[in-house]
From Swiss-Prot:
Record-given protein name: Small ribosomal subunit protein bS16
GO CC list: cytoplasm; small ribosomal subunit
Any GO molecular function: structural constituent of ribosome
Record-linked InterPro entries: Ribosomal_bS16 (IPR000307), Ribosomal_bS16_CS (IPR020592), Ribosomal_bS16_dom_sf (IPR023803)
Lineage: Bacteria, Pseudomonadati, Pseudomonadota, Betaproteobacteria, Rhodocyclales
Length: 83
C-alpha cells in the first residue's frame, strides 16, 4: 500500500521533512516513490515553511494512497494558505 508521509532530514535539533509517497513496508526515511513537497518547522520569516504539490497529492489519493494524520493536517494548512 502506498502511504504519503513525512521523511525526516536535516541536522540534529534542526528538523526538515520531505513529504513523500512511499510503500508502507519501507522505512520512514528509506526508499520512496515520489517527493510531493516539504515541511520546514524551523523556517525563518523569509523562508517558505511548507510547500505541497497539490496536483501530485491528489493524483496519489485517487490511486489509493493513504495520508498520514500529520500530512493530512499539513495538506489542509497548505490549501488554506493557497486560497
Amino acid at each position: 500500500m502506498v502511504v504519503i508521509r513525512l521523511a525526516r532530514g536535516g541536522a540534529k535539533k534542526r528538523p526538515f521533512y520531505n513529504i513523500v509517497a512511499a510503500d508502507s513496508r519501507n522505512r520512514r526515511d528509506g526508499r520512496f516513490i515520489e517527493r510531493v513537497g516539504f515541511y520546514n518547522p524551523m523556517a525563518a520569516e523569509s523562508e517558505k515553511g511548507l510547500v505541497v504539490n497539490a496536483e501530485r497529492l491528489e493524483y496519489w489519493k485517487q490511486h489509493g494512497a493513504q495520508l498520514s494524520p500529520t500530512v493530512l493536517r499539513l495538506a489542509k494548512q497548505a490549501a488554506k494558505a493557497a486560497a
